[in-house]
Amino acid sequence: MVKHSDPNSKLIAENRRARFDYFIEEEIEAGIILMGSEVKSLRQGGSNIGESYASVENGELWLINGYIAPYLQAKTWGHEERRKRKLLVSRRELARLWNATAREGMTIVPIRMYFNDRGIVKLKIGIAKGKKLSDKRATEAKRDWGREKQRLLKQHS
């Protein structure tokens, strides 16, 4: 059995809107192929995965539109901020992702990017289905009610 690392070990970036905009059906941990300057930039905290998504192309999984800030000390041999980056998953997981995206309305969204306990960059991706406006309103109402409940409990204790 594969030991999955703790995703809270060193959080780099989190897509906070993913759970608001999508129903996340399943989460998968993926490795990511990076250049040295990208890893150094991530250690400084320069990343954004809010507008990115993943797709299966030619039997490979790619992260598209993920932003990693330029590393200032690597001016000559730096990296492109929004280039396609290859994600590493097992063949079985890749087949599951491909089958999921073949269904209508399903997509692959990045949820969080972090360093695992060995210092390797990992990306938690989710198989997701987009929410309609009414679903988003229900989620927001549920969240507001939870906050109101906590406020009332805090006042009475």
From Swiss-Prot:
Gene3D superfamilies: 2.40.280.10
Coiled coil feature spans: none
Keywords attached to this entry: Cytoplasm, RNA-binding
CDD domains for the chain: SmpB (cd09294)
Cysteine disulfide links: none
One of the protein's GO biological processes: trans-translation
GO molecular function terms listed in the Swiss-Prot or TrEMBL record: RNA binding
Locations listed in the record: Cytoplasm
HAMAP family: SmpB
Role: Required for rescue of stalled ribosomes mediated by trans-translation. Binds to transfer-messenger RNA (tmRNA), required for stable association of tmRNA with ribosomes. tmRNA and SmpB together mimic tRNA shape, replacing the anticodon stem-loop with SmpB. tmRNA is encoded by the ssrA gene; the 2 termini fold to resemble tRNA(Ala) and it encodes a 'tag peptide', a short internal open reading frame. During trans-translation Ala-aminoacylated tmRNA acts like a tRNA, entering the A-site of stalled ribosomes, displacing the stalled mRNA.
PANTHER family: SSRA-BINDING PROTEIN (PTHR30308:SF2), TMRNA-BINDING COMPONENT OF TRANS-TRANSLATION TAGGING COMPLEX (PTHR30308)
Family indicated by similarity: Belongs to the SmpB family.
Protein's UniProt name: SsrA-binding protein
Species assigned in the record: Cereibacter sphaeroides (strain ATCC 17025 / ATH 2.4.3)
